[in-house]
Structure formats: C-alpha cells, structure tokens
C-alpha cells in the first residue's frame, strides 16, 4: 500500500514502487525464480537417491518442496533460475505421476501449488487452462514433459500402462499403491518422492523406507 510510503523522499518512494511492480511482474511471469528453498529444502533438493522423502507437519513446506522439485525436473534447464539448476537430475521430456489421497487434495492443494510455482510460458499453450487436460488429468509442458495425476482412491488395476521417471506421493500412499508406483519407474531408472505427515504412527513406510534404508537407496529430510 502506497500510504505506507509516507515520509519517504520522492526518489525513494519511486524506487520502492518500481521494485514492487517488478516483483509483481516476476511473480506473474516466472514465479519459480522467486522460490528460494530454506536449508532443509536445499538438502532435500540435493538428494539424488532413488527414494527421497520430505516429512513434516502441516505448513512445514513439504508440498511446496516436492512440487518445486517436480517442476525443476520437468522444465528445460534454460527455463530454470540459476540457483535451482544444480538440483536438476532429469532432462525433458520428464514423465511424472503425481498421486494424492483424493481429487479434493489434488484440486485444492497440488494443482494450486503447481499453479503458484510454474512459469506459464513453460506450459503447452502458455497457460494452465490450455495445458491441463481435465479428461485425462494430465498437465502438458511445452518441452514434452508431462504430469499425470491419480489418487489413492483409484483401484490398482487401473494404474497400469505407465512407465515414467518419477512417482510423487503427497501424503503416505497405501502399500499396494506404493508397490505399483515403484514398479512403474524401474524401466526408465526413475525415482520416488514422498511428502508426508507421520500421523498414523509406525506404518509400512517406517518398516519399508526408514528401517532398511541405505545411503544408496533412500534419503529423507
């Protein structure tokens, strides 16, 4: 608000207003360039193992970290800000299956977060509405990368026919869905990314991920 600039000189006021407008333009045109991960986020993005996890409570930033990481892998290197390029592991076309507990979570959390972060010019057609196929729940990027969205409510028998670079889970999936996802990235030497709040106590993820983990296979933050 400009009334908060009262007391500044005309020159200083103009500089602040110009900087604010420049920030607004950048937020609209290239929001990912304004994503600067905190220390734990930098550690998470730097993991290169076949399984990695961002675990934390509500508002801890785990969804932001995982979806930003998905975008880092999906975009062409030229479209990434320089401070995020060191975290790029895959080259386009990057094929990623993103899963959540329900379509409500996909629509209200995942889609919203991706729209906040993705530079519109990197999407097919230059905007979300053109790039997102509602019928197939697929997001298309201009460089050929794709995000395929499914939920844990979907029957396992309908999860076939996909071979990709990554499966990204928002909240802990049922074990059967995780096993299916793990199988789907094997052919392309892909990875799995988890973002979850440990609210159910010691579940399969403790026995299946934490307990037997090795530095070569799993890293969590």
Summary of predicted features, one role per range:
Residues 1-221:
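Phosphate/NTP-binding elements of NTP-utilizing enzymes
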């Amino acid at each position: 608000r400009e009334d908060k600039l009262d007391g500044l000189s005309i020159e200083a006021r103009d500089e602040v207003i110009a900087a604010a407008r420049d920030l607004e333009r950048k937020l609209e045109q290239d929001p990912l360039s304004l994503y600067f991960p905190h220390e734990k986020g930098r550690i998470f993005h730097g993991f290169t193992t076949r399984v990695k996890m961002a675990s934390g409570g509500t508002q801890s930033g785990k969804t932001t970290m995982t979806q930003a990481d998905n975008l880092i892998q999906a975009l062409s290197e030229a479209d990434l800000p320089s401070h995020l390029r060191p975290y790029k592991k895959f080259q386009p076309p990057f094929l990623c299956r993103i899963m959540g507990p329900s379509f409500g979570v996909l629509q209200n959390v995942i889609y919203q977060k991706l729209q906040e972060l993705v530079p519109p010019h990197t999407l097919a057609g230059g905007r979300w509405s053109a790039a997102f196929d509602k019928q197939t729940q697929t997001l298309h990027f201009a460089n050929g990368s794709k995000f395929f969205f499914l939920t844990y409510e979907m029957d396992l028998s309908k999860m076939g026919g996909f071979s990709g670079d990554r499966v990204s889970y928002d909240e802990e999936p049922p074990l059967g869905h995780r096993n299916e996802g793990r199988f789907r990235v094997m052919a392309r030497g892909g990875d799995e990314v988890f973002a979850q709040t440990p609210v159910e106590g010691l579940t399969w993820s403790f026995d299946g991920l934490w307990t037997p983990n090795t530095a070569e296979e799993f890293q969590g933050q």
